[in-house]
């Protein structure tokens, strides 16, 4: 196989990774759609993608703690702690303990947290629609090749 295509693909992967990393660290402004004015100011803050994904995990799972979040989101426990601290500060989540186990803490969503989780889901649906538009630019065979590439790439990670 021609090495120039390897070089071109490597450059594309690097550019993708850089842009993706930059996007992960940027803040996400939650739109005001579907939020009453009394809740809008509270939820209008800029949230990191990590914070939003933590809210989503808590919304869809039970017995959520730092270890669970770190494992599920493939991030460090320190990153979880930092994001959780901000969510607690803004009354998006609360800490609970199980009877008989005063040491281990779990997270639950507040009413504001449930609203934020719903808004995050709406953002995911919007992103899926944008991806579908992109996918429509390619043939089925092209998409199968890209899918095979990503699945194999994951095995190398």
Swiss-Prot record:
One GO cellular component term: cytoplasm
GO molecular function, one term: DNA binding
A Pfam match: MarR
Protein name: Uncharacterized HTH-type transcriptional regulator YvnA
Keyword Protein biosynthesis annotated: no
InterPro entries: HTH_MarR-typ, Metal_resp_HTH_trans_reg, WH-like_DNA-bd_sf, WH_DNA-bd_sf
UniProt organism field: Bacillus subtilis (strain 168)
Location in the cell: Cytoplasm
Span of domain HTH marR-type: 6-157
Record flagged with keyword Thylakoid: no
Keywords: Cytoplasm, DNA-binding, Transcription, Transcription regulation
SMART domains with a match to the protein in the record: HTH_MARR (SM00347)
DNA-binding region: 66-89
